[in-house]
Regions:
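Phosphate/pyrophosphate-binding active-site segments
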Residues: 2-23, 154, 317-424, 541-583
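Conformationally flexible catalytic loops at phosphate/diphosphate-handling active centers
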Residues: 11-24, 62, 169, 174, ...
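Active-site diphosphate/adenylate-binding microenvironment
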Residues: 29-33, 47-51, 55, 380-464
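Structural signature of the thiamine diphosphate
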Residues: 43, 87-95, 113-115, 122, ...
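Glycine-rich, acidic loop regions that bind phosphate or pyrophosphate groups
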Residues: 122-175, 266-382, 486-487, 500, ...
Length: 583
């Protein structure tokens, strides 16, 4: 494992080309690559192949384009996803023809539902050779159509066809701009090449046209915001925040809203909103609600920002009490009716809207002399009570996932990025969050467990500081080879909760009582993590009781490596189940 001092500019490990600067003689590949650079994409993750030879040659000739080589397309796509999540700019993926493209699908789907910009580029044979029993061919245009903002198809372009060269330039500009426009997301460019594929010419820098978009992030007109502020001044308001990229503007806006005397905040760990501690307390307070409180603390209006919520309890509660109004903002798709109570969607930039709304509500509350509402007091008291019970329960409980992770989350330094895997880990983070680290990430767009390792690796490469992946043994087993990756450095540390497979199946109602649960659902992967770390030269630590975390965790934070947390699966499940019957 390399240390972070061995990384090149901006903490990236890049492949340095040693051959002379020879460019591809395929004009469409040159134009595409030059437009990527002009639009300032974050870099290109290349999966080697034959049909994408022109793109690879073009990329290798351009020293101002960052490049990473990852042969497995599935891993490459998740690595690009992690990079784009941190950098908030598009990263390009390049693969060969055939099924290679479909290996991008899981990461592209995650990017689509998490609103992360990616440029998936697939090389293809000429259209006349599709479905002609030629090798490594299938119908590629539109292959990802349900999980991208738009698909583009570029035909074979000759060196003398100016109209088609203009078409390539325009299409690639459009694709990149679309990936970042309004709600960001992935796009797919399929580009056809005829043979020969490996022809070269001496590299010569060419100027390509760069198209720009002028954005407008203004809130609604002032008179409308004033009207909304007057309408909501005495209403019981709840703001829910799912996964979000970090944003200083949104942070400030939500902070201002949270200070109002008629507002309570339900912010999930992945919201990246650094607020007062009680804002993150969600599940336990809801389970502690008495029947009478369930009605008196019912919000009149719910305003939602961010992506899909982790908390099933919050969703169930709001579906049950049915707020009079539910508003979603511009980062949510029109028609997303999570609580079955949707009344309005504002196609606005959330930070600007919330900032203006908070100011307007505050103005009208002061004008009317309104004090802190019983609604706000009730939620604040309930959350504080839940936090005390959480601390008391964790302290008195035995060694378990809950106890280990509650301890670990309090020890993670503020300057670290944290990547959470799906299943139990992200839910434990919800229960134990008292403050947020620098940035919290996870694959919650579609909530699969398959790509977490490489997404975290990509995120670590894109961040100047250090990143910690917190994952379970089943999720980690999808790509344990990550610890031997050429891009693995001590910028990424890994914590694996070894609970004998999919621990969530010991908790959810649908599976926890099934006799076949362990074999068919939990499916223990039996990882030999210590041996794998030794083979890779990666520092290894292990804890199977509380004192081991006290003894080893600080050293782990300094050296990086892998920290395995071993717990008894049945005892951990029982402790978690009992947690939710606290009163």
């Amino acid at each position: 494992m390399k240390n972070d001092n061995e990384l090149s500019e901006e903490s990236y490990r890049e492949e340095k080309d040693t051959h002379p600067r020879m460019d591809t003689d395929v004009v469409s590949a040159r134009i595409l690559t030059d437009v990527l650079i002009s639009q300032k994409v974050g870099g290109m993750i290349i999966s080697p192949g034959s049909r994408n030879t022109p793109l690879i040659v073009a990329a290798s000739a351009r020293e101002n384009l960052k490049k990473w080589i990852v042969p497995d397309e599935r891993s490459a796509a998740f690595m690009a996803l992690g990079m784009a999540m941190v950098k908030k700019v598009p990263f390009a993926l390049v693969c060969t023809s055939g099924t290679a493209l479909y290996n991008y699908a899981p990461a592209v789907a995650e990017a689509y539902y998490q609103q992360v910009p990616l440029i998936a580029i697939s090389a293809d044979r000429p259209s006349e050779w599709i479905d002609q029993d030629d090798s490594q061919t299938l119908v590629q245009p539109g292959a990802l159509s349900n999980i991208v903002k738009k698909s583009f198809n570029i035909p074979v372009v000759s060196a003398t066809d100016n109209d088609k060269q203009w078409f390539v330039e325009r299409v690639v500009n459009e694709a990149i701009l679309l990936s970042m426009a309004n709600t960001p997301g992935p796009v797919h460019i399929n580009i056809q090449f005829s043979e020969p594929l490996g022809g070269t010419v001496r590299y010569s820098e060419q100027k390509v046209r760069k198209i720009e978009v002028i954005e407008n992030s203004s809130p609604l007109p002032r008179h409308i915001m004033d009207m909304l502020g007057a309408e909501l001044a005495d209403k019981r308001i709840m703001l829910t925040a799912g996964f979000l990229p970090s944003s200083e503007k949104l942070q400030k806006a939500v902070s201002n809203l949270s200070r109002l005397g008629n507002v309570t905040i339900m912010a999930e760990t992945l919201s990246n909103l650094h607020l007062h501690q009680e804002a993150y307390s969600i599940d336990l307070p809801i389970t502690m609600l008495e029947e009478e409180e369930s009605t008196t603390l019912r919000p009149d209006i719910v305003i939602s920002i961010g992506g899909a919520l982790v908390s099933r309890m919050l969703k169930t509660y709001l579906r049950k009490v049915k707020p009079q109004e539910h508003w979603t903002l511009g980062d949510t798709k029109i028609g997303t009716d999570t609580f079955q109570a949707l009344t309005r969607h504002y196609e606005v930039e959330p930070a600007a809207f919330i900032s203006a709304l908070a100011g307007s509500i505050g103005h009208h509350r002061r004008k009317r002399g309104l004090q802190e509402s019983e609604f706000k007091k009730g939620w604040t008291n309930l959350k504080e009570k839940a936090q005390r019970r959480h601390a008391k329960y964790v302290e008195s409980s035995g060694w378990s996932e809950l106890k280990a992770l509650d301890d670990i989350f309090t020890r993670i330094p503020n300057d670290r990025n944290v990547f959470l895997s799906n299943g139990t880990v992200v839910r434990y983070a919800q229960l134990s969050t008292r403050r947020l680290p620098h940035l919290t990430l996870g694959c919650r767009g579609v909530s699969g467990i398959d790509g977490t390792n490489y997404a975290a690796l990509g995120a670590s490469l894109a961040y100047g500081g250090r990143t910690i992946l917190v994952t379970g043994d089943l999720s980690f087993s999808y790509a344990p080879e990550i610890i031997s990756s050429a891009y693995m450095t001590n910028k990424l540390s890994i914590i694996v909760i070894n609970n004998g497979g999919g621990g969530i199946f010991r908790f959810v109602k649908s599976t926890k009582h099934l006799e076949i649960r362990e074999k068919y659902f939990c499916a223990p992967p039996h990882l030999e993590l210590q041996r794998q770390c030794e083979n890779a030269g990666l520092p290894y630590y292990m804890a199977n009781e509380e004192r081991h975390i006290n003894e080893k965790f600080e050293t782990f934070l300094q050296t990086g490596g892998l920290f395995e947390i071993k717990v008894n699966p049945e005892e951990s499940a029982e402790i978690l189940n009992n947690y939710f019957i606290l009163k």
